[in-house]
Structure formats: structure tokens, C-alpha cells
Regions:
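Glycosyltransferase catalytic domains, chiefly GT-A lineage
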Residues: 1-168
Length: 168
């Protein structure tokens, strides 16, 4: 089985697909999308959306790779606007030798560190206002942010931008 894949999702044209800086031997690159994309390194898998919501469509693939990538022993999810800069085999040996899953903190992203769901919500609102394309329903986001702690803001916590899995 020893097949390995790096995968991403782009629905509704929210992100631009970034080409990897490093293309490791023995790894496939797959992008699940509902738009016409072209890439030198990514295999574009155009799919019919499950939902009428881009965020939920993306999460269908992000959170459930075993349903869509069952032939792969190892899978690494990255956000569509992220890129591979180093050998993912090192990531597998460092983080999955004694675990089945590893999550990676958005705050460690050197180009765009964020550690707070409230900051993320503000960025989604700003992006939507500028571009007319919201990542999710703004009213739903506001409701979730208010409901989270009865209107009180909590200490910011990590967000997941990448996930590695041992699928065997």
C-alpha cells in the first residue's frame, strides 16, 4: 500500500492553488475542487459539491480523507493557499511514527500566523467585504462567535491548517 498523498480543497474559487516549492518522489498531489483549475503538479479532481456551501464542501474532503483517498497509506492535508517547502517524509517520520494523526497550528505559519477564531472571523468578514465572496455565511459566523461563550470572548486557541494521517 505505501502510497502517499498531499491533498487540498478549493471550492467556490476562495483560494488560489499554490504550486509546491518541493516535489518529493513518491508523493501524489491532489486538489478537490468545483472549479476549472490547471496545475503542473496537482492532479485536479473536479467534483460535484455535496452542499450549497463552499466551506462545508471543503471540509467533506479535509476531515474525511479515508472516504476519498482510501488507496493511500499516508495523507497530508494543507490549505489551498499553502505550499510544500520541505520533504513531507520527514514530517511523517517525525509525527506519525507513534501516532495516527497530527495537526498543525495556523499560528506557526510564518507568512500568516493566526491563533484565534475571532481574528479568523474578522479576516473572513474583511475578505468578504472587499471581494463579495464570503468563506461562510456571515450571519452564521456572527452567531457562532456570540454563542461560543454567551457573548464573552475567550482566550484565543490554535487553528488547524494542516493535518497528517496514517490511514493504514
Amino acid at each position: 500500500m505505501n502510497k502517499k498523498v498531499i491533498y487540498t480543497t478549493i471550492f467556490g474559487g476562495y483560494d488560489e492553488l499554490t504550486e509546491p516549492h518541493f516535489v518529493p518522489d513518491g508523493w501524489d498531489f491532489i486538489c478537490f475542487t468545483d472549479t476549472d483549475l490547471k496545475s503542473k503538479n496537482w492532479k485536479i479532481v473536479k467534483t460535484t459539491p455535496f452542499y450549497n456551501d463552499n466551506t462545508r464542501n471543503a471540509k467533506q474532503y479535509k476531515a474525511l480523507p479515508h472516504r476519498h483517498l482510501s488507496d493511500y497509506e499516508y495523507s497530508i492535508f494543507i490549505d489551498g493557499n499553502m505550499t510544500i517547502r520541505n520533504n513531507p517524509d520527514e514530517l511523517i517520520s517525525n509525527y506519525l511514527s507513534n501516532s495516527n494523526v497530527a495537526f498543525f497550528d495556523h499560528n506557526k505559519n510564518l507568512l500568516d500566523p493566526r491563533d484565534c477564531i475571532y481574528k479568523e472571523a474578522e479576516i473572513i468578514f474583511e475578505f468578504g467585504r472587499r471581494n463579495g465572496n464570503y468563506k461562510d455565511n456571515p450571519e452564521l459566523i456572527k452567531s457562532q462567535m456570540t454563542k461560543r461563550n454567551d457573548g464573552r470572548r475567550e482566550t484565543c486557541n490554535s487553528q488547524i491548517t494542516a493535518m497528517a494521517r496514517n490511514n493504514k
